[in-house]
């Protein structure tokens, strides 16, 4: 009798974000989720034009992309995609997932995002169709609980929460510190610190 074939489908994490700048919380989150779910790789996807952040100045996409490349370079499981940047127009998660599904048709996708963002998922474009494209992982500070009323019962098995202590770091705080001339060492990777300084980023518009 032939033994059943092992499940050979790859498991790929997709972490979308503005990454303005990327910080250690993003990297720890990717590593922890990869370990928790046995992911083969985690692809960081910097947004092109984030529709949720039209109320503040966002750094140029190329700067955010390069900072993400620098930050992830030392981890062979981490990769960076330009799919959202090169698509043009507003960035919507459903488009990201459809593009990734086309690129990796034989993989199980896990979309990694902040639990606070996940709490707003019903406001996202074509949000119900996204659950057929990926499992959603909300990373959060320890003790956070997602309101049971937010997600319809039918989709709750497609969502997991993972506590990440390092999520106490925020890009907003990093931008503000840089704007005020305060150090961001140990909040963001060394190469990103140097990139921010070289480019003089966040001096005029720290954002919110």
Swiss-Prot record:
GO terms for biological process: NAD biosynthetic process. It holds the Pfam family CTP_transf_like. GO terms for molecular function: ATP binding; nicotinate-nucleotide adenylyltransferase activity. Its EC number is 2.7.7.18. It comes from the Bacteria. InterPro entries: Cyt_trans-like, NadD/NMNAT, Rossmann-like_a/b/a_fold. Pathway: Cofactor biosynthesis; NAD(+) biosynthesis; deamido-NAD(+) from nicotinate D-ribonucleotide: step 1/1. It catalyses: nicotinate beta-D-ribonucleotide + ATP + H(+) = deamido-NAD(+) + diphosphate. Keywords: ATP-binding, NAD, Nucleotide-binding, Nucleotidyltransferase, Pyridine nucleotide biosynthesis, Transferase. Belongs to the NadD family. NCBIfam families: cyt_tran_rel, nicotinate (nicotinamide) nucleotide adenylyltransferase, PRK00071.1-3. Catalyzes the reversible adenylation of nicotinate mononucleotide (NaMN) to nicotinic acid adenine dinucleotide (NaAD). This is Probable nicotinate-nucleotide adenylyltransferase. It comes from Corynebacterium efficiens (strain DSM 44549 / YS-314 / AJ 12310 / JCM 11189 / NBRC 100395).
């Amino acid at each position: 009798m032939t033994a059943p074939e092992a499940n050979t489908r790859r498991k790929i994490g997709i972490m979308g974000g503005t990454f303005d700048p990327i910080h250690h919380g993003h990297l720890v989150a990717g590593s922890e989720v990869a370990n928790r779910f046995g992911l083969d790789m985690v692809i960081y996807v910097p947004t092109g034009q984030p529709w949720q952040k039209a109320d503040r100045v966002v750094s140029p996409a190329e700067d955010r992309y390069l900072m993400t490349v620098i930050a992830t370079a030392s981890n062979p499981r981490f990769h960076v995609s330009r799919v959202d940047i090169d698509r043009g127009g507003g960035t919507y998660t459903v488009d990201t997932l459809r593009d990734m599904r086309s690129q990796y048709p034989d993989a199980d996708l896990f979309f990694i995002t902040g639990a606070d963002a996940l709490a707003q998922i019903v406001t996202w474009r074509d949000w119900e169709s996204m659950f057929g494209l990926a499992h959603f992982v909300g990373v959060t500070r320890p003790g956070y609980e997602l309101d049971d009323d937010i997600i319809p019962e039918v989709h709750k098995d497609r969502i997991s929460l993972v506590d990440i202590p390092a999520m106490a770091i925020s890009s907003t705080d990093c931008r503000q510190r840089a704007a005020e001339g305060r150090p961001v060492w140990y909040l963001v990777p060394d190469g990103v610190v140097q990139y921010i300084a070289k480019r003089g980023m966040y001096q005029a518009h720290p954002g919110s």
